[in-house]
């Protein structure tokens, strides 16, 4: 892309200030800035200008409960294992985050969760996936989403660890796409004179990022019909779970979600409901007090099934989402940016920029239906989000020990 072409493109979106320092840059810096402009999706700015749509009519949605699953476990497991053996199932690990909140400078997955050994979050997840591959007798294709920040370090770490025994040929990497950061007036921030301030485009961008990386060709070549997407920060996460896959297929659903019963009405977790007759995840802050506290005749919460970011999607339905624009969520954050006089890059003490993100929960609402698959919290939900307190390293370690994992 040449300067004039970049200027014309930026003018279309009212962002020509990004070229303010162009004439002061070296040839290499100019080329890098033009490259960044050429690759950037500026259409998100138009979507960001619109208010998020209000929720429709919300109703409770029942689940395939733990007791119901136990009754049909053998049937579900056989269906799921058959699908895995056919090569119809892939797993997608969302691992773009950093471990900064855990006191770790690298990727969150390399954080050491072990106490007396070197067990990392990545190793926990690879072990859990290998449990499935041993049952099935075949590997499950694993797609790992990294970020610009941690891609090289993630690849190097897993290569050094020899993928914890997982076949390297079954592991595919792709980098999460980035979105520009804007100020209160909708102007894109500069990080330096030659670099636009960007941030990851949210966990809802995982499938479009797979497409961008050319991995939809792999799905087609290998006849992968289902993708199980899950987050890096749950060390008890059971992925490519044959029983979960089998139950979703048996129910003729186009998607499935693992859920846990909420510990209390005030637990800050998204709840899977129906919105205007379609599956939808309602965030904690979107629920009224009445909804949070509503109970059934048996005393259980009416809106009780919380999501744990473990979803199963049919690939043909995911492909349809590529033609639609997921809702854009704006998060007001502290973002390192160039000072007004252009002399230095600083990270402000107060939030100064909107990060533009899509969320995987909005992909659920685009599905015709979704099977809620209840799992035991103590066996499958040990999030590692904080250094101490709730959902922390300590609570995750306690749950790992409870499940017989040596630390």
Identify the function of each model-found stretch:
Residues 92, 111, 143, 172-174, ...:
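Hydrophobic/aromatic beta-strand patches that form the interior of the parallel beta-sheet core
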Residues 95, 114-117, 146-149, 175-178, ...:
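Short, flexible loop/turn elements at secondary-structure junctions
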Residues 103-106, 153-159, 183-188, 239-243, ...:
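Short acidic, glycine/serine/threonine-rich loops at helix termini
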Residues 85, 92, 104-107, 116-123, ...:
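Conserved structured core elements
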Residues 2-3, 234:
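Hydrophobic, well-ordered secondary-structure segments
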Residues 223-228, 236-240, 245-406:
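Catalytic core of tubulin tyrosine ligase-like
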Residues 3-172, 180, 190-207, 216-217, ...:
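N-terminal glycine-rich phosphate-binding loop and ensuing alpha1 helix
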Residues 163, 168-267:
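Conserved beta-loop-beta/alpha segment of the NTase-like Rossmann-fold superfamily
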